[in-house]
Regions:
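Aromatic "clamp/platform" in nucleotide-sugar-dependent glycosyltransferases that forms part
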Residues: 254
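A charged, aromatic-enriched C-terminal amphipathic alpha-helix characteristic of glycosyltransferases
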Residues: 306-341
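Nucleotide-activated donor-binding/catalytic signature segment of Leloir-type glycosyltransferases, i.e.
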Residues: 219-238
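Conserved donor-binding/catalytic core segment of Leloir-type glycosyltransferases
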Residues: 177-210
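Donor nucleotide-sugar binding/catalytic pocket of nucleotide-sugar-dependent glycosyltransferases
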Residues: 125-171
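Short alpha-helical donor nucleotide-sugar binding micro-motif in glycosyltransferases
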Residues: 233, 241-246, 328
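Short hydrophobic beta-strand element within catalytic cores of glycosyltransferases
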Residues: 271-274
């Protein structure tokens, strides 16, 4: 059996799109007969990330990480993140002449520059070095592919995302969800500086605003915006029920590479309001009935109130984890060349 080892610095108990994407892809790959082994911070001593303690950073040395990779006996290695584990895994692959792929999930340069006085140009030089060492770099959207290409990243392949339609779907709407008056403008995700939440929370909108999620900026924002309902983290059925109560899903981030929460909202029959940037523009562009894109976020929110819940649901059905995972596997086959004799495109039929 073909064995793919995925190395990631992002893993449980983190709650984010990277973790969900890897988790759902693993499930689908297993159905395709691929044995996936994980190398995550859970196997090593880790410390809280400065300014973001919810994220744990592994401090294991190269030999310890190398031993963990070798224990998994990989046919191929996929490196999902550019953190300490990803860095060590890249070193191991180069040293052992193991072909490998990477993926660009997070705007690493922007996130670091928002917290520390490091020039983005230096950080993008690292991104180029890191990803160009592999045989394929996977990206979620056409606009991100164009952007990274312009920054000198090579061998780019598309790996889209999916949605759990059994969990996220339209549900009956309560008259006063969260005991708040409608319309409900909702956002879901990490409550952190890079998510640009004040752009949403400062808006003069009818009805109520709800923020679902947690993160390092929550306490500060909760004090600054007492009229906004902060619920904390919700998962599973609780999260799906919450999505379905929204009238408009607001996605204020300008730094995401995709936006899994956009798909979750659309699948719940909730139109989306966002800026016309990478992620939202790739999902909603050409689908004005399902949501609104505008450089003025307030205008987008008000326009989305008149969009179609059915159009939102229909758009979400063009995404599935099965389709995305087959795309991932096809990229692995391409990157591996002849080094995966037991894995062929016949498995994708």
């Amino acid at each position: 059996m073909t064995r793919i080892t995925i190395v990631t610095d992002a893993w449980h108990p983190q709650v984010n799109g990277v973790v969900r994407s890897i988790e759902n892809t693993n499930t689908e790959l297993a159905r395709l007969g691929v044995d996936v082994r994980m190398v995550t911070p859970q196997s090593f001593y880790s410390i809280p990330c400065p300014t973001y303690p919810e994220i744990r950073l592994s401090v294991a040395g190269y030999r310890r990480v190398a031993a963990e990779i070798e224990k998994s006996q990989p046919s191929f290695v996929h490196i999902a993140t550019e953190g300490p584990l990803g860095f060590m895994a890249r070193r191991w692959c180069v040293k052992n002449r193991m072909r490998f792929s990477t993926s660009y999930h997070t705007r690493f340069p922007e996130y670091v520059a928002a917290r520390f006085p490091v020039p983005e140009s230096w950080l993008y030089a690292f991104v180029r070095w890191f990803h160009n060492g592999g045989n394929t770099c996977m990206v979620a959207t056409p606009s991100l592919e164009t952007e990274l290409e312009a920054r000198g990243v090579r061998n780019l392949k598309r790996w889209s995302r999916g949605i759990d339609a059994e969990l996220f779907h339209p549900r009956p709407k309560a008259k006063l969800p969260f005991e708040l008056p409608r319309p409900i403008f909702m956002t879901v995700g990490r409550v952190a500086v890079e998510k640009n939440l004040p752009e949403f929370l400062d808006l003069d909108l009818p009805g109520s605003k709800v923020v679902i999620g947690d993160g390092p900026a929550r306490h500060e924002l909760q004090e600054k915006y007492p009229d906004v309902r902060f619920t904390g983290v919700k998962t599973g059925e609780d999260l799906a029920d919450a999505y379905a109560q929204a009238d408009v899903f607001v996605f204020p981030s300008k730094t995401d590479t995709f936006g899994n929460t956009i798909l979750e909202a659309l699948a719940s029959g909730v139109p989306v309001a966002a800026f016309p940037v990478t992620g939202p523009i790739d999902i909603l562009g050409g689908n004005p009935a399902a949501g609104a894109l505008d450089d003025n976020l307030r205008d987008a929110c008000l326009a989305a109130l008149h969009c179609s819940p059915q159009a939102a649901l229909t758009l979400s059905r063009s995404y599935s984890w099965e389709k995305a995972s087959r795309q991932f596997l096809d990229n692995v086959i391409h990157a591996a060349g002849k080094s995966l004799p037991l894995l062929s495109r016949s498995q994708l039929a």
